[in-house]
UniProtKB/Swiss-Prot annotation:
Source superkingdom: Viruses
One Pfam family recorded for the sequence: PDDEXK_1
Protein known as: Uncharacterized protein 207
Variant or mutagenesis effect after changing V140I: In strain: Isolate variant XX
Length: 207
């Protein structure tokens, strides 16, 4: 009888490498270097076990409620292509012609993050291309610890403006993918770096 050792396989299961021809909406507008490295180096995604687990639980509970009680669509799959780069993602909730993106946070300071605007602008335009009628777009922040909730309605002009920024970001990213030296790809050098999977490799000094 052959006894298998699955330890290495389990360790390997945590490693990922993103496809070079695809970008995920949650990446857009954040860090060119991180997205570049994620497609050139096999890595383990950084996981804060407690916050990730709690955030996922809240997402599942909220989505289940909206689906069962309000007859909304959840985890709406989107696919598109911009500048030859595939776009792949899932939208949290589409309800009564409204797009809702749920974000869990661990602090009481409620303010829309710019990269979330990139994300919902991209979602909004792809849904329209998929023949959805979207009247309103909301980013909803939920404090994981206190359960305080704050929603922000995003103006259509803001969505249009950020969709153009999405296109420009993807154009630049496509060019950066051609680089052979990651040091030539710009990074953000801000608070995001602290939880980045590549912070040990990245030459940018953390603020």
């Amino acid at each position: 009888m052959v006894i298998m050792n699955y330890e290495d396989h389990i360790k390997e299961s945590f490693k990922v490498k993103y496809p070079a021809d695809t970008i995920f909406p949650s990446e857009v507008g954040i860090c060119y270097r991180k997205s570049y490295l994620a497609r050139n180096i096999e890595f383990e995604r950084g996981i804060n076990e407690i916050y990730l687990d709690l955030g996922e639980q809240y997402h599942e509970r909220i989505e289940q409620y909206f689906k069962e009680k309000l007859n909304c669509q959840t985890e709406v799959e989107i696919k598109d292509e911009i500048e030859g780069i595939k776009i792949s993602g899932r939208i949290d909730i589409v309800c009564n012609n409204d797009l809702l993106e749920i974000k869990t946070i661990s602090y009481n300071y409620f303010q829309v993050k710019e990269y979330h605007l990139y994300q919902v602008a991209l979602y909004y335009h792809i849904l329209k291309k998929q023949n959805y009628q979207i009247n309103n777009v909301y980013i909803v922040y939920l404090n994981r610890n206190t359960r305080e909730v704050k929603q922000f309605k995003i103006d259509e002009k803001v969505l249009e403006n950020y969709y153009q920024k999405v296109i420009e970001w993807i154009k630049k990213f496509k060019e950066y993918l051609k680089e052979t030296d990651y040091k030539k790809v710009p990074g953000v050098n801000n608070y995001i770096c602290k939880s980045c999977e590549f912070k040990q490799k990245c030459i940018i000094s953390l603020f």
